[in-house]
Amino acid sequence: MIIYPTMELQNGRCVTLERGRLDAPMLWHVDPFETVSGWASAGAEWMHLTDLDAVAGTSGNAELVEQIIRKAEIPVQLAGGMRSRERIEHWIDKGAGRIVIGTLAARDPELVKELAKRHPDQIVLSVDVWQGHVMTDGWRSQSAYTPEAFIDAFADVPFAAIVVTDIDSDVEEVEAKLGLISGLAAHSRTPVIASGVVRGADDISRLAYVPNIAGALVGRALFRKSLSLEDALSIAASAHERVAQFQ
């Protein structure tokens, strides 16, 4: 299981959001470049970067995102506002290791299928779930898709992974989140990355034993220092070794 240390950028600053609320960010007084360098030094294989300004439809973080991709010593999985072919291919050309797509997949599934085939193992599907439906536009619009139907619509598409987020459950309701994510991981042929689940070490241990969970985004816990990246990576690696012994 891959641990993806996660950074969210708003107005050039590192933040975390409560249930995706762009108007009420928690600001972290850290240097983005030093933070990313520390993650690479700790042994991270990937990082996840969300441009919240792009989610809101502005381009204020574009230069910073480009610099992070260029300077990071690990590949970057980039999310936020990927709503056109041009934008997706722009960031692939700029060196993003993977691009995360949600809203565009709901609006133009055929285009997303084409992009995934053109860029194998570089496109990630985002499935954000609220009240039994997939949300789009930065969690502000509800689509007609159930998460199962959304995943089924892309069953044979060569995505690198599917990121699943349970918006419904409160940040502390990890059992409910695990239930939804575990069910969708079982439903999907594509490996699933869990988002919004990890508060501490125990959550990583539990995730590691869920079939078809290939990774976890870890952001708030790292910034709060309720979990160190070194511990997260170690737990994920040792749990994977134990799972392999039983297979």
From Swiss-Prot:
Pathway membership: Amino-acid biosynthesis; L-histidine biosynthesis; L-histidine from 5-phospho-alpha-D-ribose 1-diphosphate: step 4/9
Catalyses which reaction(s): 1-(5-phospho-beta-D-ribosyl)-5-[(5-phospho-beta-D-ribosylamino)methylideneamino]imidazole-4-carboxamide = 5-[(5-phospho-1-deoxy-D-ribulos-1-ylimino)methylamino]-1-(5-phospho-beta-D-ribosyl)imidazole-4-carboxamide
Family note: Belongs to the HisA/HisF family.
EC number: 5.3.1.16
Keywords: Amino-acid biosynthesis, Cytoplasm, Histidine biosynthesis, Isomerase
Pfam families xrefs: His_biosynth (PF00977)
Top-level division of the source organism's lineage: Bacteria
Any GO CC annotation of this UniProt entry: cytoplasm
UniProt name for this protein: 1-(5-phosphoribosyl)-5-[(5-phosphoribosylamino)methylideneamino] imidazole-4-carboxamide isomerase 2
Family annotation (InterPro entries): Aldolase_TIM (IPR013785), His_biosynth (IPR006062), Isoase_HisA-like (IPR044524), Isoase_HisA-like_bact (IPR023016), RibuloseP-bd_barrel (IPR011060)
Active site positions: 8 (proton acceptor), 128 (proton donor)
Taxonomic lineage: Bacteria, Pseudomonadati, Pseudomonadota, Alphaproteobacteria, Rhodobacterales
Leading EC class: isomerase
Example of a GO MF term: 1-(5-phosphoribosyl)-5-[(5-phosphoribosylamino)methylideneamino]imidazole-4-carboxamide isomerase activity
CDD domains: HisA
Intracellular or extracellular location(s): Cytoplasm
Matching HAMAP family: HisA
GO BP annotations listed: L-histidine biosynthetic process; L-tryptophan biosynthetic process
